[in-house]
Amino acid sequence: LECYQKSKVVTCQPEQKFCYSDTTMFFPNHPVYLSGCTFSCTEEGNRRCCTTDKCNR
């Protein structure tokens, strides 16, 4: 999972999408955000695929 950070915004390679998920919860009401760039991101559950880590499509 390789990302590039430009001005506090992480971008991916042109053919990649930034995928983040907030489904992992080790403690109640404390979601752990998992994010990274991937070639194959599937939007299922609470996962979202975006062009940047701010999730603007």
Curated annotation (Swiss-Prot):
Disulphide-bonded residues: C3-C19, C12-C37, C41-C49, C50-C55
Summary of the function given for this chain in its UniProt record: Anticoagulant protein that prevents the activation of factor X (F10). It acts by potently inhibiting the extrinsic tenase complex (ETC) (IC(50)=116.49 nM), a complex composed by active factor VII (F7a), tissue factor (TF) and F10. In addition, it shows weaker activities on other complexes. It weakly inhibits F10 activation by inhibiting the intrinsic tenase complex (IC(50)=4.05 uM), a complex composed by active factor IX (IXa, F9a), its cofactor factor VIII (VIIIa, F8a), and their substrate F10.
Cellular compartments per GO CC: extracellular region
Membership in a protein family: Belongs to the three-finger toxin family. Short-chain subfamily. Orphan group XX sub-subfamily.
Keywords attached to this entry: Blood coagulation cascade inhibiting toxin, Disulfide bond, Hemostasis impairing toxin, Secreted, Toxin
Upper taxonomic lineage: Eukaryota, Metazoa, Chordata, Craniata, Vertebrata
Keyword ATP-binding: no
Miscellaneous comment as given in the Swiss-Prot or TrEMBL entry: Negative results: does not show activity on procoagulant, anticoagulant and fibrinolytic serine proteases such as FVIIa, FXa, FIXa, FXIa, FXIIa, alpha-thrombin, kallikrein, activated protein C (APC), plasmin, urokinase, and tissue plasminogen activator. Does not induce hemolysis.
InterPro entries found in the cross-reference section: Snake_3FTx (IPR003571), Snake_toxin-like_sf (IPR045860), Toxin_cobra-type (IPR054131)
Compartments where located: Secreted
Keyword Chaperone among UniProt keywords: no
Coarse class of the protein's main subcellular location: secreted
Tissue expression summary: Expressed by the venom gland.
Record-given protein name: Exactin
Lineage top rank: taxon: Eukaryota
Organism encoding this protein: Hemachatus haemachatus (Rinkhals)
Molecular function terms, GO-annotated: toxin activity
